[in-house]
């Protein structure tokens, strides 16, 4: 169990890393620079993390865990969970976009679509299909990657389309494939 001082130090480091990621890629961020921006000494940094990449992984893990927790209640309340999921991502789009830009895309996609609440949505889609197991696997992968690309482009845009419009686009694509 972490005490308050540890939580504050980690929060300052996370905030500092996110601030730096807005300016440059992860591989150009040094521990020295991160600690200066975070106002935390390097000894404290190394007490909890081995590298900025390790800190970024923790930020991603926290984001995914929070997303899953928030989505569980949304999915329980709605048969069509797509709109609540998109609303949630829109509300957290700055962090989502930073993570997707800062991590290998395949790794981020694998983590995102392995979240239990998101897996449930896609599993429900697979249950509706009449395709063989092999076809379902490839169609599902295609939908995952296409959905991620749509989300990335949508959330990175200067003036994103309304959530309902993106939900409609994804629903139309899903119906065409499934």
Listing of model-derived features with the role each one plays in the protein:
Residues 145, 153-178:
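C-terminal peripheral helix-coil segments that are non-catalytic and often amphipathic
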Residues 24-27, 159:
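Flexible coil/turn residues that form the inter-helical turn or adjacent wing/linker of helix-turn-helix
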Residues 23-24, 130-131, 175:
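Cytosolic nucleotide-binding catalytic cores of signal-transduction proteins
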Residues 32:
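Residues within the helices of the helix-turn-helix
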Residues 10-18, 27-28, 36-39, 46-75, ...:
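An amphipathic alpha-helix adjacent to DNA-recognition modules
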Residues 76-122:
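Helical hydrophobic small-molecule/effector-binding pocket
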Residues 105-149:
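Amphipathic alpha-helical packing segments from all-alpha helical-bundle domains
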Residues 1-6:
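N-terminal intrinsically disordered/low-complexity leader segments
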């Amino acid at each position: 169990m972490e005490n308050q001082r540890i939580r504050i130090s980690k929060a300052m480091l996370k905030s500092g890393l996110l601030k730096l990621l807005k300016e440059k890629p992860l591989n150009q961020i040094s521990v020295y620079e991160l600690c200066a921006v975070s106002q935390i000494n390097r000894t404290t940094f190394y007490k909890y993390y081995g590298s900025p990449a390790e800190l970024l992984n923790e930020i991603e893990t926290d984001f995914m865990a929070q997303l899953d927790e928030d989505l569980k209640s949304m999915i329980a309340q709605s048969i069509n969970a797509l709109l609540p999921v998109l609303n949630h991502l829109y509300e957290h789009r700055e962090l989502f976009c930073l993570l997707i830009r800062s991590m290998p895309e395949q790794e981020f996609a694998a983590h995102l679509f392995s979240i239990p609440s998101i897996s449930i949505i896609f599993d429900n889609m697979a249950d509706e299909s009449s395709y063989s197991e092999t076809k379902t696997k490839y169609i599902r992968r295609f939908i995952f990657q296409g959905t991620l690309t749509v989300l990335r482009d949508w959330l990175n845009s200067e003036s994103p389309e309304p959530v309902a419009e993106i939900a409609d686009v994804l629903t139309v694509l899903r119906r065409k494939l499934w």
